[in-house]
């Protein structure tokens, strides 16, 4: 698709375009009433009304001329032109596949499981799911925030903002040129494969939301495209645009071969992986490893005898080379910070939730630190927000705490990637400094003798006041006093009580 920009006078035609899109979704919803189409996730019967409602909210918010949404290149107007054009095209494809109500000669090939038409409908449902997620991320409750969207991985966020500014969407050709200046890719089939992986909505453009999902899936940043090439191009276990039900169907052929597995980007938790595998007793299971690099998960699964045969094949690719490049980010603690925490009878590296273990993981994108055990327990309680600030947890990063006196060249070469530019290798990562302020401290863990209290992590955290040095007292001019045995005779003296 060519680069789409908001045409002159688009602001007057935008309400009509949004109205047409809502009516299109309503017509498709009428065609999806057959119970044989009620499958998922994702399910068109659920997605169509939710997308229509979100578009109504967008239209309402955009009608308020006082909002002042960014309307420059790649802003709110450009995004809506691209989005609505793509929505109309995908809507027509869905309409051609779905049976029309009241017509007995309608297409019946869409109902049988495994048919070509059913597979096309499942892929379109995935695209509609991605489009709804993208619109929700850039227009939460209908209000545009694409210019403020924060990419989860720090280095990826820096790359986008330095090269794209406040734009939320770019034509593929322009984005390809920018990315290749940082991560070179040969033109041809590999570039086409990269485009199909990045462009989740199949619009011919790349949004900041799609780039966020891609960098979360194929982290870490220094080896981003190496990871993608090994996992999405060369690995036989990778499956693109596959749903939960289709994974179950595909693995049925390997039920007599425990250890067979395939993996796909999750359609319910974008930015995370879903792995389907055949267990030792022949049952088919699917799991979503929360906020962990797929490389580490597959290696551990191979070691444990769970992920052995990708798509039933005997050869399991070796991922150890890429895992060796995944180094812990080193958080540097200055002398000032050490003194600040000592004044609170604590230490910077101590986890402020359990007060037992040291911090070894950072929540992304908010950046709060805690120990991995507390984070695992917190997420096990089905909470996907930070226990400190309640921001959504989109990722995690292993870290180690380095005090100021421990600086050395060896530490400098094993630091993380948040401050380096895209041309540096992993061994050249720089230390990242931390703002000299104490994080908010949640309450301590209750004693284990009271298992009924399972909500200890949901209590609202309180913030300790930032400690400041004592204010200096003003200097007072010295006064010569006459020393006598009778203090009452001094001028200005008061009577003793």
UniProtKB/Swiss-Prot annotation:
Keywords: Calcium, Metal-binding, Phosphoprotein, SH3-binding, Transferase, Ubl conjugation, Ubl conjugation pathway, Zinc, Zinc-finger. One of its GO terms (cellular component) is membrane raft. GO terms for biological process: cell surface receptor signaling pathway; negative regulation of epidermal growth factor receptor signaling pathway; negative regulation of MAPK cascade; negative regulation of neuron apoptotic process; protein catabolic process; protein stabilization; protein ubiquitination; response to glial cell derived neurotrophic factor. It is an enzyme of class 2 (transferase). Residues 219-321 are annotated as: SH2-like. Residues 7-145 are annotated as: 4H. Ca(2+) binds at residues 199, 201, 210. 4-O-phospho-L-tyrosine binds at residue 264. The modification Phosphotyrosine is found at residue 341. Residues 351-497 are annotated as: Interaction with RET. Phosphorylation at Tyr-341 is necessary and sufficient for the activation of E3 activity. A zinc finger (RING-type) spans 351-390. Residues 7-321 form the Cbl-PTB domain. The keyword Calcium applies. Its EC number is 2.3.2.27. It holds the Pfam family Cbl_N2. Residues 322-350 are annotated as: Linker. EF-hand-like and Sh2-like domains are required for N-terminal inhibition of E3 activity. The N-terminus is composed of the phosphotyrosine binding (PTB) domain, a short linker region and the RING-type zinc finger. The PTB domain, which is also called TKB (tyrosine kinase binding) domain, is composed of three different subdomains: a four-helix bundle (4H), a calcium-binding EF hand and a divergent SH2 domain. Acts as an E3 ubiquitin-protein ligase, which accepts ubiquitin from specific E2 ubiquitin-conjugating enzymes, and then transfers it to substrates promoting their degradation by the proteasome. Functionally coupled with the E2 ubiquitin-protein ligases UB2D1, UB2D2 and UB2D3. Regulator of EGFR mediated signal transduction; upon EGF activation, ubiquitinates EGFR. Inhibits EGF stimulated MAPK1 activation. Promotes ubiquitination of SRC phosphorylated at 'Tyr-419', has the highest ubiquitin ligase activity among CBL family proteins. This protein has one functional calcium-binding site. This is E3 ubiquitin-protein ligase CBL-C. The gene is Cblc.
């Amino acid at each position: 698709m060519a680069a789409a920009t908001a045409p002159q006078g688009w602001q007057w035609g935008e309400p009509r375009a949004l109205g047409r899109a809502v009516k299109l979704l309503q017509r498709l919803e009428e065609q999806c009433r057959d119970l044989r189409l009620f499958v998922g996730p994702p399910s068109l019967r659920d997605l169509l009304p939710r997308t229509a409602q979100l578009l109504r909210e967008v239209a309402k918010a955009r009608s308020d001329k006082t909002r002042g949404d960014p309307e420059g290149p790649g802003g709110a107007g450009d995004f809506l032109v691209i989005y609505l054009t793509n929505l109309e095209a995908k809507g027509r494809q869905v309409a051609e596949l779905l049976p029309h109500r009241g017509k007995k000669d309608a297409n019946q090939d869409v109902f049988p499981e495994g048919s070509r038409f059913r597979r096309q409908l499942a892929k379109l449902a995935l695209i509609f799911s991605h489009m709804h997620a993208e619109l929700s991320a850039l227009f939460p409750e209908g209000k545009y925030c694409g210019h403020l969207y924060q990419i989860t991985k720090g280095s990826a966020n820096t790359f986008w903002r330095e090269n794209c500014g406040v734009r939320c969407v770019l034509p593929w050709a322009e984005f390809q040129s920018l990315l290749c200046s940082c991560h070179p890719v040969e033109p041809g089939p590999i570039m086409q494969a990269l485009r199909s992986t990045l462009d989740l909505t199949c619009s011919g453009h790349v949004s900041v939301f799609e780039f966020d999902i891609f960098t979360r899936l194929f982290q870490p940043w220094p080896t981003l495209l190496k990871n993608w090439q090994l996992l999405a191009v060369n690995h036989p276990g990778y499956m693109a645009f596959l749903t939960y039900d289709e994974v179950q169907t595909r693995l049925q052929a390997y039920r007599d071969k425990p250890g067979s597995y395939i993996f796909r980007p999750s359609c319910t938790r974008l930015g995370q992986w879903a792995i389907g595998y055949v267990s030792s007793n022949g049952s088919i299971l699917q799991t979503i490893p929360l906020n962990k690099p797929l490389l580490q998960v597959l290696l551990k699964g191979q070691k444990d005898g769970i992920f052995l045969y990708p798509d039933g094949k005997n050869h399991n690719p070796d991922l150890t080379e890429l895992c060796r490049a995944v180094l812990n980010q080193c958080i540097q603690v200055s002398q000032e910070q050490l003194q600040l925490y000592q004044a609170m009878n604590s230490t910077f590296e101590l986890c402020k939730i359990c007060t037992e273990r040291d911090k070894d993981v950072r929540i992304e994108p908010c950046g709060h630190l805690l120990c991995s055990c507390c984070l695992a327990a917190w997420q096990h309680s089905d909470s996907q927000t930070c226990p400190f600030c309640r921001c959504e947890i989109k990722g995690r990063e292993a870290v180690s705490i380095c005090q100021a006196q421990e600086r050395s060249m060896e530490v400098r070469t094993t630091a993380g990637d948040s401050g380096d530019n895209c041309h540096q290798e992993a061994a050249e990562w720089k230390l990242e400094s931390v703002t000299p302020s104490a994080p908010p401290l949640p309450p301590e863990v209750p004693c284990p003798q009271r298992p009924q209290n399972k909500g200890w992590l949901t209590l609202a955290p309180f913030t300790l006041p930032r400690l400041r040095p004592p204010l200096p007292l003003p200097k007072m001019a010295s006064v010569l006093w006459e020393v006598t045995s009778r203090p009452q005779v001094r001028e200005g003296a008061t009577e003793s009580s």
